[in-house]
Amino acid sequence: MAVINRTPDSFFDQGATYQLGAALEAADRAVAEGADILDVGGVKAGPGDEVTAAEEIRRVRPLVAALRARYPGMVISVDTWRAAVAEEVAEAGADLVNDAWGGAEPELAHVAAAHDLGLVCSHASGLTPRTRPHRPAHADVLGEVRGYVTAEAARAVAAGVRPDRIIIDPAHDFGKNTWHSLELTRRTADLAATGWPVLVAASNKDFVGETLGLGVTERAEGSLAVLAVCAWEGARLFRVHDVRAAKEALAVVTKLRSTGLRTRRT
């Protein structure tokens, strides 16, 4: 899943793909490098200037429409928590709604069902979108995340979303500190055991940077390490900034698993 941001203030690319032409060029590169999904975003995850639903639609709908025309067989995802945005991008040709904010707008699942879209059900610690808690605390982060995302998946099914179109995401760093995100990485197999496909969106995240003591532009290798561990433990989808590197890392993990190597359990 390749990240294609139409945001002027993205934490990683700082607006490099904000203009429509630049976003399309980034999508072309991602497809050439082997992306299976293009994930379009119009609002950065962190705090910042207010972005209304109308402005988010202005940013993402034309890009979705252009990508659908250019790549008829590509899976197009939109990173949004808003039902109104999902409605618009569904009409433009989107296939998947990537809700990183844990069902902040419950109506989103009904929109996904009405348009036969896929839906990512994530755990955001009950946060209001685009906010960060002070000193997040979880007595049992795995148990809380697993319980929440499976309940969200069940609610999506009840709303009419097809079960084979539901994905779960532990949402590293969303309402979680570095220890929590590392623990979820270590315990990916427990999330995969729920039976729902697991999405990992850890590329260049703060927990990687804090673990290594590195800034946002220096986290590529650490991000690949997280990707490899999560892939080994059963994650199925990976939201990344560098498609080529991710595909190569995943190819090695796949080869190792196919040759019979197994992790040691104690």
Describe the predicted segments one by one.
Residues 28-32, 152-165:
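Phosphate/pyrophosphate-binding loops at sites that engage ATP/ADP/AMP, CoA/4′-phosphopantetheine
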Residues 25-41:
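Catalytic domains of carbohydrate-active enzymes, especially glycoside hydrolases
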Residues 1, 35, 75, 95, ...:
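Hydrophobic "anchor" residues on beta-strands that sit immediately upstream
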Residues 8-26, 45-69, 75, 80-84, ...:
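Active-site-adjacent loop and "lid" segments of alpha/beta metabolic enzymes
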